[in-house]
């Protein structure tokens, strides 16, 4: 059997939260973070607790409500967080038109999903175009760009290629890792996704 998949996923997420929280705290300036496919808000709250102003976007109204409740229970009710129920791709396209930029972008896209108006999301077809769009709203002195993918269809090397290609204008470094679950009876690791981190040098 597979050992607590959710537990290991949570451990991996917390490692990412610790990583970017330190970057936000050490930036020495105000940091604007965009969190796409933001679910129940773990990354949003970690970034806000570290001192960032956060825009939290998810297509599910129920998830955004849950995330707001998590903010209250975490003592972050009054933190500078903007809560939005929206299709992530359409939101980014509007931000490009508005000329808004962010110092850091986090995304945790599903393998498959639907936007609030029935928009279809398929990670294999849409992740690279979305990274390309996000590069257009990344500030000149960006801190980090984080993509988590819980699908085996996206290898770490592919994630590194996509992020490196779209963020080549920034002076930074990409590191991508496989996310895996330990299988108790064999000692092997079951691949379940990949995580790609870009950080400024």
Feature locations, PLM:
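Single conserved hydrophobic/aromatic residue that forms the stacking wall/gate
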Residues: 1-12
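Conserved class I S-adenosyl-L-methionine
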Residues: 30-37
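Conserved SAM-binding loop of SAM-dependent methyltransferases across substrates and taxa
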Residues: 40-52
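Conserved SAM-binding motif I beta-strand of class I
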Residues: 53-58
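S-adenosyl-L-methionine
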Residues: 62-104
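Helix-to-beta-strand junctions that scaffold the AdoMet/dcAdoMet cofactor pocket
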Residues: 138-140
